[in-house]
Amino acid sequence: MELHILEHRLKVASIAKENIQLFTYGLIKLAFLSSKTRCKFFSLTETPEDYTIIVDEEGFLELPSSEHLSVADATWLALNVVSGGGSSSSSQPIGVTKIAKSVIAPLADQNISVFMLSTYQTDFILVRERDLPFVMHTLAAEFTILQVVNGETVAADNLGVTNGFVKPKLVQRPVIHPLSSPSNMFCVTSLDPYTLPTVTTLLMDVMFYSNGVKDSVVGSEEPDHIRFFSFSLIEGYISLVMDVQTQQRFPSNLLFTSASGELWKMVRIGGQPLGFDECGIVAQISEPLAAADIPAYYISTFKFDHALVPEENINGVINALQVSQAEKH
């Protein structure tokens, strides 16, 4: 298996809901007029708390400097696992539960914090740039590590870090944060970039302007219903995560879905904002899912984490994670 270190240098930022109008010009340019920018990696996720942005340094320049933009203090690098040769876009993606044992757990064992972004196409593991030597040392035995340089995939330089490593003890990793499962059903989908202009107005409404009456009506009918929408445009590929009510607003022939039309339920992780320094949160969730062979998407945001699991597995997932929670007591 190959681990690709992509060349994007990323910023992770948060915008409060009430301040989004200060940033819509730049965000619309990044999402819908990307040919007018040098940005190659852009993701915007709306949660009930805020908007989380993951964007490369070129794209970050499109956003105004503002006290209303909270930026995590590190530069992040995106890694992804590819089974076999070829570019990351053409090879088979591997679900987050499939990389739980080989990537997520070993990094947690070495106290390396990760930030996850699953998309329709693949799973990106974000690590702080300063942690890269430790990441490579930790994963070198398991993977062929390749680096993308000027668009070419080449063997990664061995950064030769050996100090400070101890063979980790195999520890139990109980789930330590509160879990909740909203009532929404979600789909993970994509669309052809050439069709983006036909739904730009709709997407702009969904992303920035639909916080009005419709949502409050839905909310009153289903108290556990939450606002969650994720749009990613990464290296020319679009990924969308939305609930079924939002999906129904789109022309059905434009969205890609799996042949099974799979629907997903969400597990939200965290009672208080999680921060960026705690290690092992993704591992706490993904390891029990991997043990049960349950596929999952995983989306970290500025304040909370979100796992998406097949609708039919949600009860088993909650039970497995609650068992893990009980083990900490």
Swiss-Prot record:
The keyword Cytoplasm applies. Its main location: cytoplasm. The keyword Mitochondrion does not apply. It holds the Pfam family ACT_7. GO terms for cellular component: cytosol. GO terms for biological process: cellular response to L-arginine; negative regulation of TORC1 signaling. It is found in: Cytoplasm, Cytosol. It comes from the Eukaryota. Transmembrane segments: none annotated. Residues 72-139, 262-322 form the ACT domain. Coiled coil: none annotated. Keywords: Cytoplasm. PANTHER family: CHROMOSOME 1, WHOLE GENOME SHOTGUN SEQUENCE, CYTOSOLIC ARGININE SENSOR FOR MTORC1 SUBUNIT 2. May form homodimers and heterodimers. Belongs to the GATS family. Functions as a negative regulator of the TORC1 signaling pathway. This is Cytosolic arginine sensor for mTORC1 subunit 2. It comes from Xenopus laevis.
